[in-house]
Amino acid sequence: MGIFGTVAQTEQHYADIASGVAPQDPFIWSACWTLMDPSRAPDGKHTLILDTFVPSKLRDGAAWESRKHEFASRLLEKFRRYAPNMTARNILGEYIDTPESIERANPCLVNGATTGGERTLAQSGCFRPVPGYSQYRSPVRSLYLTGASCHPGGGITAMGMVTAQEILRDLAAKKP
């Protein structure tokens, strides 16, 4: 489930990121993976992920580690407007990632960018990986683009399939 506001709120979210401040009214992506894979939690329990974009570095120089609980509370407070049953009573534990912890766990995720590229509007959606190259072809003949840095972005597993379809389409067009 995605919780997004108006266009103006989304623009403000990205403006906050660009200026190095934690978004005041963040948009949220959520997933309850145990609905599809119950093995991810004990019987009768579920897992829930809340995700959003934040600046990799805070303008005031603070580490995200020192702000993560406050920011996670802000996300959960907003999420509760749509899922009021998410009370402290039924949250048994939490794990909060930060840009720093993500990069520590996997140095390839520079600045904690799990979706590849920067978390800016200019590198989102059809602008991935960069404007003009969202159709999985590079300017080099027979060199195709795929992966988290391509449209639609990391966390969505379609990029490999779409790239393969483009390659097959090109190969079919070359047949006599």
Predicted feature locations:
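Short, glycine-/Ser/Thr-/acidic-enriched flexible segments
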Residues: V7-Q9, W33-D37, P55, R119-L121, ...
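Mid-domain catalytic core of redox enzymes
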Residues: M1-R40
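Catalytic cores of large soluble enzymes that bind and process phosphate-bearing ligands
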Residues: G2-Q9, A22, A63, R67, ...
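Conserved FAD/dinucleotide-binding core of flavoprotein oxidoreductases
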Residues: P42-R74
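A glycine-rich dinucleotide-binding beta-alpha-beta segment and adjacent secondary-structure elements
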Residues: P23-A31, R81, N85-H151
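C-terminal structured subdomain/cap of oxidoreductase catalytic cores
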Residues: K45, R67-L75, T114-P176
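Redox-cofactor-proximal catalytic regions of oxidoreductases
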Residues: A31, D37, A41-L50, R137, ...
